[in-house]
């Protein structure tokens, strides 16, 4: 069975012993990856009923983080339990956002969620920046968003 982030987090929830480094893919560029798949979205449902559900990812990362200078967690664009786990485990956040109107509204919701996580779960969480993506400098909306 391929080791994925979903498998790792499920094992933490079940309090099973595991080699936290098994399944981590190492590359020549000195970048390691923990693969993921659609099972991660299924994990959302399991996290709802898990004990200490906001800290499952933090508990896993605490086993491996000393080996790395940085750990990047690329979340899906939702505010579900996996994203909340990532926010609870993170030191800081970089928010990618498209230079358009509707994604800006989503960012407002995300900022509100980050504030709640900071208040209740992870007091040290900071926002390191906002990364604009898909910027078309020819449009007025993109120009005003960049400003």
Q: Predicted segment positions?
A:
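P-loop NTP-binding core
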Residues: 1-147
């Amino acid at each position: 069975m391929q080791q994925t982030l979903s498998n790792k987090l499920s094992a933490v929830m079940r309090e099973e012993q595991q080699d936290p480094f098994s399944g981590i893919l190492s590359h020549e560029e000195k970048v390691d990856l923990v693969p993921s798949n659609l099972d991660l979205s299924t994990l959302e449902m399991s996290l709802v009923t898990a004990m200490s559900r906001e800290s499952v990812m933090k508990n896993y990362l605490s086993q491996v983080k000393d080996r790395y200078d940085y750990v990047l967690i690329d979340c899906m664009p939702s505010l579900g339990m996996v994203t909340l786990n990532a926010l609870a485990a993170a030191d800081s956040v970089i928010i990618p956002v498209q230079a358009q109107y509707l994604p800006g509204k989503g960012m407002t919701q995300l900022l509100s969620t980050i504030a709640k996580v900071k208040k209740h779960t992870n007091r040290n969480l900071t926002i390191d920046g906002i990364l604009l993506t898909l910027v078309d400098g020819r449009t007025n909306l993109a120009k005003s968003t960049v400003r």
